From Swiss-Prot:
Residues binding S-adenosyl-L-methionine, per UniProt: L72, G103, L122, S123, P124, L125, T126, L127
Protein name listed in UniProt: Ribosomal RNA large subunit methyltransferase H
One GO cellular component term noted in the UniProt record for this chain: cytoplasm
Keyword presence, rRNA processing: yes
Stored PANTHER family: METHYLTRANSFERASE, RIBOSOMAL RNA LARGE SUBUNIT METHYLTRANSFERASE H
């Protein structure tokens, strides 16, 4: 199983890249964790946000292919680390790749939300999207460590 973090935005600060890659390199070879960046639509004073969201959504779903779509969205279901570890086991048993979708400044397109088999809420707070990349990578790594009795996670 491969986990793909599909996120809108390509020009992230260095700390985001460093933070994400710190966790990405820790994943085992049989469960690679990769980042796919979708270019953000051009936003401006007269931008057609609905059209931009639609284009970003199509690109995200295209990048996912046949993988299981899991959106990161405030109205999604919050998971504890133990619950995320159980989700990870369930996803592995499902046999498909996992696509974790992070939208752009206006969130996810209706098409992405409709395609989602699950929706995960990291927090009721609105978080900066660059930070979410790092938090998701760490959270999924921690869940993996729990499922394999790796010493990273401590109660």
């Amino acid at each position: 199983m491969k986990i793909q973090l599909i996120a809108v935005g390509t020009k992230m600060p260095d700390w985001v890249k460093v933070g994400f890659e710190e966790y990405q390199r820790r994943f085992p070879k049989d469960m690679p964790f990769e980042l796919i960046e979708i270019p953000a639509g051009k936003r401006g004073k007269n931008a057609d946000i609905k059209r931009i969201l639609e284009q970003e959504g199509k690109a995200m779903l295209s990048a996912c292919g046949r993988g299981k779509v899991v959106t990161l969205d405030i109205p999604g279901k919050p998971w504890t680390t133990d619950q995320l570890a159980r989700q990870l086991e369930s996803w592995k048993n499902d046999g498909r790749d996992i696509c974790l979708l992070i939208g752009g400044p206006e969130g996810l397109s209706p098409e992405c939300k409709a395609a989602a088999e699950q929706s995960w809420s990291l927090s009721p707070l609105t978080l900066p999207h660059p930070l979410v990349r790092v938090v998701v990578a760490e959270s999924v790594y921690r869940a993996w460590s729990l499922t394999t009795n790796h010493p990273y996670h401590r109660e």
